[in-house]
Amino acid sequence: MDNKHTLAALFAMGVKGEAAGPGALAKRLGLRPREARKEMQDLEEAGMVELVRGSARLTSKGRRSIRVVFIGGGFELIHYGHVYTISKARKLGDALVVSVARDSTIRKRKGREPLISEGDRVRLLSSLREVDAAILGVEGDIYVTLQKVKPDIVALGYDQYHMEGEVKREAKKRGMKLRVVRLDSPYPHIKTTRILKEL
C-alpha cells in the first residue's frame, strides 16, 4: 500500500473528527483490520503517525508528506460542472477536503432556502470517489475553516467570488502558507442558478 494513500486517509479521518483506528482505516481503504494495523505500525516506526489509544494521528512529518487540497462551495445541485471542478482539484494533491456552505450562508447569499440541506450535501459529496473529506464550513468566514484544515492548496472554482490574491493575503495573516489556484471549466454555462431558472 502507498504511504501517501494511507496518510491521506488518516488526514481526512482527522479533519472529519473520526477515530482512526485499524477497523475504521481498514474499512476506508478496503483492507483487512490486521493489514491496516500493520500499515499504522509501519507509519509509526517511520515517524509519520503517532498512535494514541489505538488511533493514529499524523505527525508533522506525516502531514508534510502529503499535499492537501481544499475547495469550497454551496453544492446544492451536483452537476457536471461540480464533478469536473472536484476532479480537477483532486488531481492537484493527495487528499481533497471539500467545505460545504451552511444553509444559513445559502440563505444570505442567494436569498432563498437551500434546495438540499447542508447535511445531505455533505453526505452526497462524501460519496464521491475524489472527495477524501466533506465538511461543513464555518458561516461567513472561510478562513476559520482553512485554519482547521491547513491545506497546501486552495482551489477556487472558475466562478467563485473569492480572489486568489485576497485568499493568499488573508491566509498569510493567519500564519498559513498556501498556494491558491483558479480552476477553469469547459462548462461555464452549467450553473445551479441557471438550471433552476430553466426548471
Model region roles, listed by residue range:
Residues 1-199:
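Nucleotidyltransferase catalytic core that binds NTPs
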